[in-house]
Amino acid sequence: MKKLSTLMTMALVAMMALTLTSCDEDYDIAYTLEGTWRGNMYVSSVYDGYTYDATYTELCFVQDPYRYSSGTGYWIDHYAGDAPWRYVANHTEWKVRGGVIRIHLMEEDTYVEIANYRLDDNYFDGTIYYGDTKVKFRMNHTSSPNWNDYYYGYDYWTGYYAKPAPGVRAASGDTKPMRVFRTQE
C-alpha cells in the first residue's frame, strides 16, 4: 500500500510539473514584450476614398501585475503630412497564450494576432494575422519600465520632467478612418 501511495504521489508531482511549463513561457514572452516598440507594421488607413500609408507604428505593452501574461497598452499609427490626421490611436488589451500574442484594438473592436515571431530586449519581428491578411513586421524596443528609473505620469521636455498637458478628443460624430494592413510586394 505504501508503495502504491508513493507511486501515485510521484505521478501527481510529475503531472503538475508538466502542466505548469507553458505558463512560464507565456510569462517570459509578456515580460520581454513589456515597454514601447517602434517600427513599420505596414498599416494604411482608408478615409473618404483615399488610402494613406503610416510612416511608423508605436506599440506599448503594460503588463498586468496580477495576470502576468496579459495587460493593456496602446497602438498608434503615425502618418505623414498629406494625411488629414497626424496619427490614429487605439487603446489595447493583450494576452499571450500558447506563444501567440492576441491584441484587442478597443476603439475599433477588432483583434490582431502576432505569431511566428522573434522577440528579445531590442527587436521584435514576425507576422501579423488580421483576418485573412498576413503581414511581416519589424520593430525596435524604445523604452521599458524594466530598463531604468520610471517617472510615472511625467514626460521629458527640454531637460525637465513635467506632467503632460491634457489632450483633446475628437467629437463622437466624426468619421473615423479604417485600418488596413497592406501586403509587401
What is each of the regions a protein language model found here?
Residues 41-44, 74-79, 103-107, 127-132:
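Beta-turn initiation residues at beta-strand->coil junctions
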Residues 29-54, 91-93:
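Tryptophan-anchored aromatic micro-motifs
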Residues 9-19:
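Bacterial N-terminal signal peptides
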Residues 89-98, 129-185:
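Edge beta-strand at a domain terminus
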Residues 49-100:
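N-terminal glycine/threonine-rich, aromatic-flanked beta-hairpin/loop signature
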Residues 1-10:
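Bacterial N-terminal signal peptides that target proteins for export
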Residues 3-4, 17-41, 148, 159, ...:
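Bacterial Sec-dependent N-terminal signal peptides
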Residues 98-123:
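Acidic, glycine-rich flexible loop segments
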